[in-house]
Amino acid sequence: MPFVTVHMWSGRSKEAKAKVIKAITDALTESAGIPAEATQVAIIEVPQENWGIGGVCASERQAHQPHP
């Protein structure tokens, strides 16, 4: 039984997280033949200020990105 952990920035909707869980489950079913009911997915939400990219907090990087 696979257990998949996804770390991602916090702030996504309940619906978006449900889509992530379904997509991962479907991918394992289609690619490895694992029954959907055997797959577990955990989403761990991390605030951007606790996430570093290239030595800089993601919240700082986002603040300096141009917005469309």
Predicted regions located by residue number:
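A domain-level signal for the structural core that forms small-molecule/cofactor-binding pockets
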Residues: 2-68
